[in-house]
Amino acid sequence: MELRDLIGALEAPMLMGADNVDITNIQSDSRRVTKGSLFVAVRGTAVDGHAYMDSAIEKGAVAIVCEETPSYLEGRCSFIVVKDSAEALGLLVSRWYGDPSRKLMLVGVTGTNGKTTIATLLYEMFRKMGHKVGLLSTVCNYIDGEAVPTDHTTPDPLTLHSLMARMVEAGCEYAFMEVSSHSIDQRRISGLSFDGGIFTNLTRDHLDYHKTVENYLKAKKKFFDDLPAGTFALTNADDKSGLVMLQNTKAKKLTYSLRTLADFKGKILESHFEGTDLIINGREVMVHFVGRFNAYNLLAVYGAAVSLGKDPEEVLIVLSTLRSVSGRFETIQSPLGYTAIVDYAHTPDALTNVLNGIHEVLDGKGRIITVVGAGGNRDKGKRPLMAKEAVKLSDQVILTSDNPRFEEPDDIINDMVAGLTKMDMERTLCITDRTQAIKTATMLAKKGDVILVAGKGHEDYQEIKGVKQHFDDREKLREIFSTQQS
């Protein structure tokens, strides 16, 4: 593709040099540049691509997109100067792949909790309705039925548009994706054409990156601000930030709620470990999900499907057949008559939601034993809050290690303990080894009790000193249960 055809996707680019050069590929990592590359110099959180423009030229880049050009490089290749090279990258890659997101009905899901569940259930629902569908999520990306492993909630623009192009090639009509606050702030979703957006909730998370809750909220809100007319913006009316998301959007404004009047109104009739009886917009449905937080997720799924033109009755029928997402309130039964639940809850609010969901079902008839940790090199402020919520809503808590990364696990546990009183500590054990922590919980549990193993969910690794070592909470529990005699 010629450079002039590519830069037509950009707003007011300043070209220095020839525009008729042939581009063989687009790169934002100078190490991947080859002969004929267009190199986009992006200012990242840790690395500034502008420092590698010289290296990119030496490796064969014939054009560079940047925010400023050093005079000593002028004349060595074509330069395109833009206001925001991160924004430009997405637009260029989209053009390179033929703007694939415009050929799909693309819906983004953002918020602190619930993104994976909502995006995955929409993917499964639309497949059950006979459509070819794509999914971009924390757990895995899917092109119709083909799994494509993932490392981030939202991939980089090169991967993202490449996946979208593969979805179009595979005949997909719809795509559902998680949209993280990082990806919005870093313009990783630049160049994508969304047909709708869903907001779940907003609680403390990622403050190691955003610094304040206000910045975190602004990042989420920008996604809705950028939705054009003719799309839909569906928000949780019961979350204090829900209506804020709709303030400046041009999209059709829609709400879902369990507490107030809304376009999609739900009510919980009864909860049990097999599922929940719900009323949605006056129609009763039995679903295979537990807890109030999941009722919100299902309302969002219902609302999005109806907003995409699906028949409400058909949506309810399919909703009743859907099952829980991997590592989200995933139940494993012990032969000794107690239940283990593995959940990804890794924020204070998510932990509260899951524990409240367990209480709704137990109704005071069994004890709750919670195994929980906090990730290393992430928001330290949430550590004492996690411990506090766990103790408040559990009968016994075991604090343990959870992806310590480059921190010492005991230091993280000490940060968690800082949120507890002497009385709280009477119901709290600190066991650094996660395997031992899970084993201890199973030794303490009796018939009718529930063990919650929180924080990792679908993850099958522990990240220690930069190395991901295999570790799966579900595997550990099944190994223990396989040795138990009823």
UniProtKB/Swiss-Prot annotation:
EC number: 6.3.2.13
Keywords associated with the record: ATP-binding, Cell cycle, Cell division, Cell shape, Cell wall biogenesis/degradation, Cytoplasm, Ligase, Magnesium, Nucleotide-binding, Peptidoglycan synthesis
Residues annotated for meso-2,6-diaminopimelate binding in this entry: R378, D402, N403, P404, R405, G455, E459
Subcellular location: Cytoplasm
Binding site for UDP-N-acetyl-alpha-D-muramoyl-L-alanyl-D-glutamate: S30, T153, T154, S180, Q186, R188
HAMAP family associated with the record: MurE (MF_00208)
NCBIfam families given in the database record: murE, PRK00139.1-2, PRK00139.1-4
Protein name from the UniProt record: UDP-N-acetylmuramoyl-L-alanyl-D-glutamate--2,6-diaminopimelate ligase
Native source species: Parabacteroides distasonis (strain ATCC 8503 / DSM 20701 / CIP 104284 / JCM 5825 / NCTC 11152)
